[in-house]
């Protein structure tokens, strides 16, 4: 159906599903085997599944159509400001840009607990989100946006050096 209507369906490496780790994402993507079925790459979800985002990126590169900007730390799986965790965001984004990535970057400001997120998280959302980073969702979004701009600026400066 996706091919018939020329749309692209996306699989996200969401925690606690079969396709949460890179190896299983790759199985799903290769089994479907369609140019109309691609991957969303979410740095934090890989970290929270104890995966190495760089290894995940290397395996899934041919399938990545969309990138979620969200970071986390291995130690306790807590979401942190993008670029400050173990997601290797700047390094991997640079690689994506260098290979010609022109897709979307979606900010996921999961720095505070909000009602709709509670409904999405299978585990208790306060285990991965600490309300100490931002006072509310608007501030969390602004912080993530500014952190992403800094990451992109660093990449641009490195390219121009």
Report residues per predicted region:
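Histidine-acidic metal/acid-base catalytic patches
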Residues: 21-41, 47-161
């Amino acid at each position: 159906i996706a091919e018939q209507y020329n749309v692209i369906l996306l699989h996200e490496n969401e925690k606690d599903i079969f396709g949460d780790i890179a190896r299983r994402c790759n199985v799903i993507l290769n089994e479907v085997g369609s140019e109309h079925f691609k991957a969303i790459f979410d740095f934090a979800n890989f970290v929270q599944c104890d995966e190495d985002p760089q290894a995940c990126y290397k395996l899934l590169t041919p399938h990545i159509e969309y990138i979620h900007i969200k970071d986390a730390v291995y130690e306790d799986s807590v979401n942190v400001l993008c670029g400050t965790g173990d997601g290797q965001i700047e390094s991997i984004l640079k690689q994506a840009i260098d290979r010609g990535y022109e897709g979307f970057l979606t900010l996921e400001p999961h720095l505070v607990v909000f009602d709709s997120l509670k409904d999405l998280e299978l585990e208790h959302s306060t285990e991965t989100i600490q309300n100490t980073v931002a006072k509310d969702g608007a501030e969390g979004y602004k912080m993530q946006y500014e952190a992403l701009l800094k990451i992109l600026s660093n990449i641009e400066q490195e390219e121009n050096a």
